[in-house]
């Protein structure tokens, strides 16, 4: 089966597993997905992720608060294959007035909205996470 938007598929898998309070979720591997997951881990939205040697799937450990409250409240794909969304460093929006992050694909790799503003680089706005 051909997937037209693998990033949206990854976000949907994380969203669905999060809603059902699963501890882990499997995601088909790619370099871009690994980079996005690295940013999500750095920002504290997921616990961990790893790619086993014998597998093509990334295993993502989701993060929950001590009272079983979900850390990820929402995920939204912004730039889609049919409608790409680009922004300069000054045009990158804040997500929930800074409570969430925008994932931006730049020439320096995948950055959060605040990192992109500090680095003065724009790019494609991939998703919002809050």
Swiss-Prot record:
Gene3D superfamilies, sorted: 3.30.1370.30, 3.30.1490.10
Record InterPro entries: Ribosomal_uS8 (IPR000630), Ribosomal_uS8_CS (IPR047863), Ribosomal_uS8_sf (IPR035987)
Annotated GO MF terms: rRNA binding; structural constituent of ribosome
A Pfam family it matches: Ribosomal_S8
Coiled-coil segments: none
GO cellular component term, pick one: ribonucleoprotein complex
Annotated keywords: Ribonucleoprotein, Ribosomal protein, RNA-binding, rRNA-binding
PROSITE patterns: RIBOSOMAL_S8
Taxonomic superkingdom: Bacteria
Keyword DNA damage attributed: no
One BP term from GO: translation
Subunit (UniProt): Part of the 30S ribosomal subunit. Contacts proteins S5 and S12.
Family, per entry: Belongs to the universal ribosomal protein uS8 family.
Function: One of the primary rRNA binding proteins, it binds directly to 16S rRNA central domain where it helps coordinate assembly of the platform of the 30S subunit.
Protein's UniProt name: Small ribosomal subunit protein uS8
Source organism: Phytoplasma australiense
Upper lineage: Bacteria, Bacillati, Mycoplasmatota, Mollicutes, Acholeplasmatales
């Amino acid at each position: 089966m051909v997937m037209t938007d693998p990033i949206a598929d990854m976000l949907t898998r994380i969203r669905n597993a999060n809603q059902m309070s699963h501890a882990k979720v499997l995601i088909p591997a790619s370099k871009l997905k690994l980079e996005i997951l690295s940013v999500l881990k750095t920002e504290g939205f997921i616990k961990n992720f790893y790619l086993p040697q014998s597998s093509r799937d990334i295993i993502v450990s989701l993060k929950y608060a001590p009272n079983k409250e979900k850390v990820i409240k929402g995920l939204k794909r912004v730039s889609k294959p049919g409608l790409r969304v680009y922004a300069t460093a000054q045009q990158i929006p804040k997500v929930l007035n800074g409570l969430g992050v925008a994932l931006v694909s730049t020439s320096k790799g995948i950055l959060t909205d605040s990192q992109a503003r500090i680095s003065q680089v724009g790019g494609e706005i991939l998703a919002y996470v809050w």
